[in-house]
Curated annotation (Swiss-Prot):
This is 4-hydroxy-tetrahydrodipicolinate reductase. Pathway: Amino-acid biosynthesis; L-lysine biosynthesis via DAP pathway; (S)-tetrahydrodipicolinate from L-aspartate: step 4/4. The active site is at H156, K160. InterPro entries: DapB_C (IPR022663), DapB_N (IPR000846), DapB_N_CS (IPR022664), DHDPR_bac (IPR023940), NAD(P)-bd_dom_sf (IPR036291). GO terms for cellular component: cytosol.
Length: 270
């Protein structure tokens, strides 16, 4: 049975890549494509929007009207929009893949609560490589973390609105959890002026925003005389789109619960 996928934010950079990924993936098809109310893209053929040619599915701004045309929703938009789409999915009992970042604690709690009724994959990054890096960071932190300085450097395009990136924060959380630290108290997100010496248990973050950088993350485990760097560089958003579609296929057999790409890729059994 073919899984029908709905994509919100279909006119955005990720939305167009998601349409392409769905089009080129066996076992799935695009069921509906959505944009915000008032968007000039409403009425446009979704395939033409994504550069794959006409596919006969028009972009719409009404999820309710299209509810019978898709089984699962993929959302890479903004936090306020995602929470609205999440409420719709709970009401209609449709599963959702969330790639949006920048949620506050209240919104994260709403996602956790929704997962009692539907199945959700919520991840900061859908790249297979990045999620493998998460596991490598845990292993590096276990061996080196208590004896070195840890710094996370991330770079993205000039249009990204949140900082540090959700992926950088997830990297910090994986490291902090491994070391038994609380990232909220041990994370350092800016340094300016006379800051004093670096504390040994800090996890530092540095952010770069420039041009069209898709996404780059490097973590330093720096000791006196040597430094280990673990890096991931994305050259195309298609890696995130393919991962999200893979997550949607995996999620289609679930009834409820909150999952991430560690579950999708079965990384805990490595």
């Amino acid at each position: 049975m073919t899984l029908k996928i709905g994509i919100v934010g279909s006119g955005g950079r990720m939305g167009r890549q998601l349409i392409q990924a769905v089009y080129h993936t066996e076992g799935v098809e695009l069921g509906a494509a959505f944009e915000r109310v008032g968007s000039s893209l409403v009425g446009t053929d979704a395939g033409e929007l994504a550069g794959i040619g006409r596919i006969g599915i028009k972009v719409t701004d009404n999820l309710t009207q299209e509810k019978g045309n898709f089984d699962i929703l993929i959302d890479f938009t903004r936090p306020e929009g995602t929470i609205q789409h999440l409420a719709f999915c709970v009401e209609q009992h449709k599963n959702i893949v969330i790639g949006t970042t920048g949620f506050d604690d209240q919104s994260k709690q709403a996602i956790q609560q929704a997962a009692q009724n539907i199945a959700i994959v919520f991840a900061s990054n859908y790249s297979v490589g990045v999620n493998l890096v998460f596991k490598l960071l845990e292993k590096a932190a276990k061996v080196m973390g208590d004896y070195c300085d840890i710094e996370i450097i991330e770079a993205h395009h000039r249009h990204k609105v949140d900082a540090p990136s959700g992926t950088a924060l997830s990297m910090g959380e994986h490291i902090a959890k491994t070391l038994g630290r609380d990232l909220k108290t041990h994370g350092v997100f800016s340094r300016e002026g006379i800051t004093g010496e670096r504390k040994p248990d800090e996890i530092g973050f540095s952010t770069i925003r420039a041009a069209d950088v898709v996404g780059e993350h490097t973590v330093w485990f720096a000791d006196i005389g040597e430094r280990v760097e673990i890096s991931h560089k994305a050259s195309s958003r298609m890696t995130f789109a393919n991962g999200a579609v893979r997550a949607a296929k995996w999620l289609s057999t679930k009834q409820e619960g909150l999952f991430d790409m560690t579950d999708v890729l079965d990384l805990n059994n490595l």
